[in-house]
């Protein structure tokens, strides 16, 4: 039996803030310790599960709703689910929390200029040139979490430091390293 309880760790932040990078490192460390982990990443999911959706507010909300449903199924089966989605709107993140239940909101915080510097795809430049509509942080708002469960400052921390904070939080809240008697009951 695994020493873990299902939970969704929801990484939110601007494009380029480091959501996927930190989630991959958390996934690597947890799997190395034998935990069952599944990572849902915005870029990958949009190629498969939500390819019919665009980037209007309504489509973004629907994207989050669908992914919340998948995360809920995984979480209910005691999988540690790492979700990396910009998820720019507070209300949609609150809806995700309500759908999923066991939910940890992680604000991956980096200043816009840092995110732009990290942008290898040139998306920010295209958005600033008017070539991409509804681009979060440029032509569409990002509503930062008001009370995230955890905040990572990826402009001031290494990837390993950020990942360690997430893993320590999971331990503190009793999602990993559970004693056998808790799991049996």
Swiss-Prot record:
Residues the entry annotates as binding ATP: 13-20
Class of the enzyme per the UniProt entry, highest EC level: transferase
Pathway info: Sulfur metabolism; hydrogen sulfide biosynthesis; sulfite from sulfate: step 2/3
Alphabetic keyword roster: ATP-binding, Kinase, Nucleotide-binding, Phosphoprotein, Transferase
EC numbers: 2.7.1.25
Its job: Catalyzes the synthesis of activated sulfate.
NCBIfam families recorded: apsK, PRK00889.1, PRK03846.1
Protein name stated in the entry: Adenylyl-sulfate kinase
Gene source species: Halothermothrix orenii (strain H 168 / OCM 544 / DSM 9562)
Name of the gene this protein is made from: cysC
